[in-house]
From Swiss-Prot:
PTM statement from Swiss-Prot or TrEMBL: Phosphorylated by LCK. Dephosphorylated by PTPN11.
Sugar attachment sites: N37, N71, N92, N105, N129
Sequence ranges on the Extracellular membrane side: 19-152
Residues bearing PTM Phosphoserine: S189
Topological type in the membrane: Single-pass type I membrane protein
One Gene Ontology molecular-function label: protein kinase binding
Top-level taxonomy: Eukaryota, Metazoa, Chordata, Craniata, Vertebrata
Gene that this sequence comes from: CD28
Coiled coil residues, start to end: none
Protein name: T-cell-specific surface glycoprotein CD28
Length: 220
């Protein structure tokens, strides 16, 4: 932007000298909503003459933005060979260029050029002072009642949902493992705490009682 401001001092308005046309422009314009109107005022009578008015972009005027060609008695031809959306209108000692759909990176200095094509002699203007067109970005304010969620918000929602599902699966798996482990410990504990049982009383087999014999009595 500083370079463009310095350019205004490098290209002062040129006064009419013999076969030159004086062209004046506004020093600076701001393009709101990506559109701007630039008027090129000249001090030359173009009535009944065929002329060509063009708008150029850059300090070296390398880009021809828009062209208005014709005369007062015929319909003007307006065109752009560089992709700009432009229109033109011929007024009283002025040509107005209407530029639309401008981009922020098209902020630059623009120069008007007026040429008398017919009848001879050919006339044009010295380089004018130029106009800096500052294209401001279009900011859309969200509705306060129904604000539209931004893309990062949905990304966070999706990531949060995935993490929640993962946490739920891990929790369920842990609970299942814990229940099974607890059941296994209980079964093992019951087995270890079982007291050994003594075998039941066995039935004793008694010999039938027989009184002892006194063999001495038999001897006597």
């Amino acid at each position: 932007m500083l370079r463009l401001l310095l350019a205004l001092n490098l290209f002062p308005s040129i006064q009419v000298t013999g076969n030159k046309i004086l062209v004046k422009q506004s020093p600076m314009l701001v393009a709101y909503d990506n559109a701007v109107n630039l008027s090129c005022k000249y001090s030359y009578n173009l009535f009944s003459r065929e002329f060509r008015a063009s708008l150029h972009k850059g300090l070296d005027s390398a880009v021809e933005v828009c062209v208005v060609y014709g005369n007062y008695s015929q319909q003007l031809q307006v065109y752009s060979k560089t992709g700009f959306n432009c229109d033109g209108k011929l007024g009283n000692e002025s040509v107005t260029f209407y530029l639309q759909n401008l981009y922020v990176n098209q902020t630059d200095i623009y120069f008007c050029k007026i040429e008398v094509m017919y009848p001879p002699p050919y006339l044009d203007n010295e380089k004018s002072n130029g106009t800096i067109i500052h294209v401001k970005g279009k900011h859309l304010c969200p509705s306060p009642l129904f604000p539209g969620p931004s893309k990062p918000f949905w990304v966070l929602v999706v990531v949060g949902g995935v993490l929640a599902c993962y946490s739920l699966l891990v929790t369920v798996a842990f609970i299942i493992f814990w229940v099974r482990s607890k059941r296994s410990r209980l079964l093992h504990s019951d087995y270890m705490n079982m007291t050994p049982r003594r075998p039941g009383p066995t039935r004793k087999h008694y010999q039938p009682y027989a009184p002892p014999r006194d063999f001495a009595a038999y001897r006597s």
